[in-house]
Amino acid sequence: DFDHIVFVPMHKKKRRERGFNQAEEMAIQLSKRMNLSVIEAMERTKNISSQTKQEKFNRFSRSKSVYRSLSGRLKENARILLIDDVLTTGATLVACAESLKRNYACHITVLTFAFTPESGEV
């Protein structure tokens, strides 16, 4: 059981350019089926270049300072379903989960809709 759904945020500039955040859209559709509220509890504070070409170590170090949880959005110890579109190294989800746990001491379950295997795994 979950209290809320939280999605991985996109930087405001990129969101304006694209017109939508795919993780948010997935969260909204899932919330309708699960009868849960979607809470915008995170923000992306930096508009860094895409991490798709970065090595695993670089992704983790770059992601740490990019995501911030917003205060007053969730109750403490909430059970959160954290949504992202694609899992590659896990750096984004780890950064978001750490920020949420640090500020809300919440319980987090992660759901992604795709996985990018490392080369040679397929």
PLM segments and residue spans:
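Conserved PRPP/pyrophosphate-binding segment of the phosphoribosyltransferase/PRPP-pathway fold
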Residues: 1-81, 89-122
